[in-house]
């Protein structure tokens, strides 16, 4: 039943979001870094839904199943960038070093999922496109939104002599 599917999709998505946030808290040991780590997912999800709406892609059973996968995969780029930023404290250096690796791993993941578009079963193709878009938008969010957040964080939480 579609109502069961929607409810299960919602539950699995909420579980994935909460689990990822807890893991970020354990990893970074600071709530501010855990929230920053969630930013690529938030913006990536909004952009993904927007792209799907504009392009006429409808949510279906396979797309709903893709959402927890996007959460699990979409968080990776941001985590790598955050860890490097905590070491370097220089956004340009972070993106020149770790950014290259993150770009290549994201592109290979997107191509792997995008290849599902050619599947005979249309549901699998739809899932592949959703994953392609979702992973891509999470990456773009990591690339464009996270550096702005770094700047804001540094200004808000810098010691008085650093402001």
Role assignments for model-derived ranges:
Residues 1-163:
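Membrane-embedded transmembrane helical bundles of large multi-pass transporters/channels
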């Amino acid at each position: 039943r579609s109502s069961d599917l929607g409810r299960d999709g919602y539950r699995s998505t909420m579980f994935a979001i909460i689990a990822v946030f807890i893991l970020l808290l354990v990893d970074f040991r600071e709530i501010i870094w855990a929230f920053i780590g969630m930013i690529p997912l938030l913006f990536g999800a909004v952009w993904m839904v927007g792209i799907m709406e504009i392009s006429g892609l409808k949510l279906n059973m396979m797309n709903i199943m893709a959402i927890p996968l996007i959460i699990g995969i979409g968080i990776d780029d941001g985590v790598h960038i955050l860890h490097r930023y905590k070491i370097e404290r220089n956004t340009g250096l972070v993106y020149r070093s770790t950014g290259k690796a993150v770009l290549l791993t994201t592109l290979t993941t997107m191509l792997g999922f995008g290849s599902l578009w050619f599947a005979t079963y249309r549901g699998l193709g739809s899932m592949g496109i959703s994953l392609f878009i979702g992973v891509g938008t999470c990456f773009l969010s990591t690339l464009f939104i996270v550096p702005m957040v770094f700047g804001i964080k540094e200004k808000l939480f810098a010691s008085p002599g650093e402001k």
